[in-house]
Amino acid sequence: MGNTIGKERQENDEELIQHLVQLVDGGFLDPQGVYSSAPAYKTNIVRKLMLERRLMPFYKGLDSYSKDWPADKVVEVVEKALGPHKSALLHCAIRQSRSLSVGNTRSLKRDSRGSSDHLLTRNRSNSTPGSISADYRTTAITTIYANAMECPICFLYYPSNFNYTRCCAQPICSECFVEIRRAEPHLPTVHANEPTPNEFDLISEPAKCPYCMTERFGVIYKPNPKLTPFSFNNNPDTLPSNIAPMGTLSKSSLPLHHIPWPPNQHIKFAHDDKNVVSTDFIHPDWQYKLERARRRALRRAANATLLNSHLLETGPANANANHNTDLSHDPTSHGGPRRTLSSRRQHYLANVEQLMLAEAIRQSLLDAQSNDSTNSLPSTEVSQPDSTNISNEQEIVQPQPTHTTNVALVEEINRPDSVESAITASSSIDTGNENETQEVNSDSLPQFVHQTMTQTNFQESSPSVAADETRVHNVDEYIEQQDLDELIHSPIASTNPFLADQFARSETVDLNAHICSPALSVSDDGVTATNKTQSSFPSVYEHQLKSNELERGH
């Protein structure tokens, strides 16, 4: 296996060396690196065309050139552009071309290898016997690059034997010509009022001239007789019948001898002329690429059709039911072929539209139900206090012990803020006009009771207060008056400023009622008093104790 790989590598190296040492009209058979991309053309076809002198060989392009340069300057610029290895090969080819003879290919390759290694190490004096003289090398290079021209596409200077376009007679080098090819297969351009092409109707348009945009681009080439001596290692069998071996090529044997060169712009050649080399000729695989692209497009279209049909067949259950119903009711579908893809797609879209409409209706019903539940929520909250009001009214109608209400009021009094308010209210009673009394108006009793309950800080919610106010309006005046008298005659009436003021103004209340004196206070409650004398009236603390005992006894 190792011997096989080594043998293949050796054959490839020999083929590469053979192509490198081949010289046609002072040019090479391989590109010189103007374009870094891999060659897309058929190399064998291009090399054969160059050997047949139907196409300009590959020359090393120069970045700059002037006709006024001396010979040494031209040689220096060319050798610098070629590099040491290609310069040695060129020198070897020029030396071998002096004899104008073609020897054995292997002997020439062996001689070229030895000459290349020798030329890289020797000095410029060239005093070694059998080596090419400096004068002849200079003459050969200056002859090849005499009257160099610039390529309008790559802007490099090449020898004057250019390719010329068949349509407009514009120069173009072989480096640029072999890169021009057809575009990739694509859909045709659609203009207005034209039907849309199918996905697999691909086309491959011929390459156009980069100068005049003429289709089916091609070039013509006429070799320069002055450069014929600078050819080396050419096989005479590869030359066409109308081209003589080098050294004997004459003007009469050229097929284009009757055409002035460079050609005139008015002279045009047909794309199928035998002297024209078209881009399709050096890129013969364009038909294969077009057919491959069409087959690939057909496969994609077929796969898409199968996928769509599969999705339609495996759609919703109601869609299948609708399809079956339509088929059963269709009088023209008895034993007939399956429906086309367009009809199935229309049914599928109709079913999707129905599903979307049903979903929209369902969403609207859900929104309406949620709105109704939101609106009914406050009415339920309002209706709850009604039952509470009824129960509260029943409690008010039933006679309750006086001490129960007193205990609730005493608990409210125990807070420091209530005691302070009680002291302030009692002081206002003592300093007020005791003789001024006023009969309590029965019509203002509900409002009065509501103010009393609010100021005594009863911990009731706002709905309960509103319910109590509504309830007071509905009870009998007798029960209201009775409850009010019980509150006014209670011993703790002086702790509430409103009850104390009502008690002071009432003419029916006994002035000797047991009212807690504001001058008395208890140290446990944290109340300081200016007068600590004993009084016959019980203090707030004593009354609270008695009330607690009564509550426990009850």
UniProtKB/Swiss-Prot annotation:
Keywords: Cytoplasm, Phosphoprotein. The modification Phosphoserine is found at S127. The modification Phosphothreonine is found at T128. Transmembrane segments: none annotated. Residues 103-132, 314-343, 369-403, 523-554 are annotated as: Disordered. Its main location: cytoplasm. Residues 108-120, 543-554 have a biased composition (Basic and acidic residues). The keyword Translocase does not apply. GO terms for molecular function: ubiquitin-like protein ligase activity. InterPro entries: Sip5/DA2, Znf_C2H2_type. Residues 122-131, 528-538 have a biased composition (Polar residues). The keyword Cytoplasm applies. It is found in: Cytoplasm. GO terms for cellular component: endoplasmic reticulum; fungal-type vacuole membrane; Golgi apparatus. May negatively regulate the snf1 kinase. Belongs to the SIP5 family. This is Protein sip5. It comes from Schizosaccharomyces pombe (strain 972 / ATCC 24843) (Fission yeast). The lineage of its organism: Eukaryota, Fungi, Dikarya, Ascomycota, Taphrinomycotina. The gene is sip5.
